[in-house]
Amino acid sequence: MHNASDIQSALVPMVIEQTAKGERSFDIYSRLLKERIIFLVGQVEEHMANLIVAQLLFLESESPDKDIFLYINSPGGSVTAGMAIYDTMQFIKPNVSTVCIGQAASMGAFLLAGGEKGKRFCLPNSRVMIHQPLGGFQGQASDIAIHAQEILGIKNKLNQMLADHTGQPLEVIERDTDRDNFMSATQAVEYGLVDAVMTKRG
């Protein structure tokens, strides 16, 4: 019985390269990493975040002055996992250019907006969605109150950071993230989440 990740990894294409020492084969993501391209695809969770952070740190060690390109196609996910990626993006020396392919929702949209100003893009038919953080907790009333306070604190922090990245007033962000707020690529530019719609490679 194969699990989903085994099947997925079996479907990842391999690229053959000729080198002075003969042929070398790479999976497609490793080959793109050589071009300083990182893919953030699927749910944002701890394991994925660790891999993205490791790739960012590796590319910084390789060339601290060259841009890194982070392609995002994600429905969102864990706030703490997303913040690990976000903080690393801000921490490292290279500029991180973000590109939305497909969708960037929730934490995916936050990471999209967190790219280097002037280097954040959407492809023409991609979708972006912002909303407030989700939380579900069961237990004693006092514990529920503690978690509710934590979620409120996270919501306020994320809203302030989105305001900083988009240039929108905080009260506008608070209003617009109160419910799921979907945007086209053009609307995401107008809102300040990205800087341009990219139709062709420049």
UniProtKB/Swiss-Prot annotation:
GO terms for biological process: protein quality control for misfolded or incompletely synthesized proteins. GO terms for cellular component: cytoplasm; endopeptidase Clp complex. Its EC number is 3.4.21.92. It catalyses: Hydrolysis of proteins to small peptides in the presence of ATP and magnesium. alpha-casein is the usual test substrate. In the absence of ATP, only oligopeptides shorter than five residues are hydrolyzed (such as succinyl-Leu-Tyr-|-NHMec, and Leu-Tyr-Leu-|-Tyr-Trp, in which cleavage of the -Tyr-|-Leu- and -Tyr-|-Trp bonds also occurs). This is ATP-dependent Clp protease proteolytic subunit. Belongs to the peptidase S14 family. It is found in: Cytoplasm. It is an enzyme of class 3 (hydrolase). Pfam families: CLP_protease. Fourteen ClpP subunits assemble into 2 heptameric rings which stack back to back to give a disk-like structure with a central cavity, resembling the structure of eukaryotic proteasomes. GO terms for molecular function: ATP-dependent peptidase activity; ATPase binding; serine-type endopeptidase activity. Keywords: Cytoplasm, Hydrolase, Protease, Serine protease.
